[in-house]
Amino acid sequence: MIIERLVGNLRDLNPLDFNVDHVDLEWFETRKKIARFKTRQGKDIAIRLKDAPKLGLSQGDILFKEEKEIIAVNILDSEVIHIQAKSVAEVAKICYEIGNRHAALYYGESQFEFKTPFEKPTLALLEKLGVQNRVLSSKLDSKERLTVSMPHSEPNFKVSLASDFKVVMK
């Protein structure tokens, strides 16, 4: 089965009205536009998203829906650094330092709380900066993602030369 577009999200439906099968994804797999996965019930699916969400697949995104059958995304819990800022200045410092490392940054559960995937160097940096943090297991859902940039990604557009293209040497 080839999935080329999203059909909706489980939060907009009553999941009890459907037979829901899930594709379990790690947080870093949610940004893939082309991939192969197996659902919990053993169905092979290929994803080739034409208009992939800019931030990636989110928890509950519906990949397939036919009558009462649904295949939806489940983002697995992973080891995450939960960061609690004490002030707006500390928020700026956190965003700068995490962004400087090109690490993913997500909104947390409350104001001034953020999440980033666990990496020892990031944890050491936060400790050095005196930023309150703790390592927990939780979901990193794309809809909560702050950073949009994606290193080493392929562009989502085609490049072609215009018929009137000219190179001028001066």
UniProtKB/Swiss-Prot annotation:
Keywords on record: Chaperone, Cytoplasm, Nickel, Nickel insertion
InterPro entries with a match to the protein in the record: UreE, UreE_C_dom, UreE_N, UreE_N_sf
Keyword Transport: no
Subcellular location field: Cytoplasm
Predominant localisation class: cytoplasm
CDD domains reported in the protein's UniProt record: UreE
Organism superkingdom: Bacteria
NCBIfam families: PRK13261.1-6
Sequence similarity: Belongs to the UreE family.
Protein name per Swiss-Prot or TrEMBL: Urease accessory protein UreE
Organism expressing this protein natively: Helicobacter pylori (strain HPAG1)
Source organism phylogeny: Bacteria, Pseudomonadati, Campylobacterota, Epsilonproteobacteria, Campylobacterales
